[in-house]
Amino acid sequence: MITPPPLVILGFGYTGRWLYRLAHEQSGRILASSRQPERHLTEVPPTDRIRFDVTDPTSWPTLPREADLIWTFPAIPLDQVQEFAKQHCHAHRRLVVLGSTSAYDRHEQPTMDLPPWIDETSPINADLPRVQGEEYLRAHHGAIILRVAGIYGPHRNPVDWIRRGRVGPTNKFVNLIHVEDLARLCLQALRQGQAGTSYNISDGQPRRWVEICHEVSARWGVVSPRQTLAEEAGKRIRNHKALTQLQYTLRHPDFYQALRSIEGLPA
């Protein structure tokens, strides 16, 4: 059996921590990076910690040359992203970059009650700095771009968002993905994704906040104190390409079952 190359997780936030844990299910060395590893990587063995800051070229050589990369933070600023990639994103290195479905935000879009479905052929907003960095990495260095919907999971619970009034019963569509599914899709993209392509990462079930608020209220009696305000229509993200090409079955396809599990709420 061929041992896979080392994997470096660039960034150790919410998604990075899940990635680090799940990546240990595969063989091979897993390393994690942070701008302040002694502060943010305490759960990682010291031998697997890397100081990396895309804005600090002196930190770039710390990455093992043979390692693949999963890049979890915004690919900005563009000039530093370009310089790093020219020096360190060689042809044999697999690179997965986490983007956002906000790449599809376009100010000139008319407001409509039922927005059209968005897939990977839909236009993106190249004026966004993050999108510029992602597209440079995709077009020039074969990066696999994952355009990620809203992330939820343990300690990032939409029921709490409603309870605290962060969201209310608006007609805006929201697209979500459980953090475990996101992390597993990152690893699957690293193994099977096509270099230089992009994938939309969501559960494929866009919902209006008013529908979510109604269901959460009916099931668990949680009501948002936020007043309903006129908002944009939101987006409806299609995930077919990711699930089929990456050959992945969602672990959390039932949103409300996932919410119940996250907080131990009654069914």
Q: Where does each model-flagged region fall?
A:
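Glycine/proline-rich active-site loop of Rossmann-fold NAD(P)-dependent oxidoreductases
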Residues: L128-V131, H140, I151-R164, E180, ...
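Mid/C-terminal beta-alpha module of Rossmann-like enzyme folds, strongest
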Residues: A183-Q188, Q192-N239
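N-terminal Rossmann-fold NAD(P) dinucleotide-binding loop
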Residues: G16-R17
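Active-site Tyr-X1-5-Lys
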Residues: T121-I145
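Conserved Rossmann-fold NAD(P)-dependent oxidoreductase catalytic core, especially the SDR/UDP-sugar
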Residues: A85-N125
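C-terminal amphipathic/interface module of NAD(P)-dependent oxidoreductases
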Residues: A230-A267
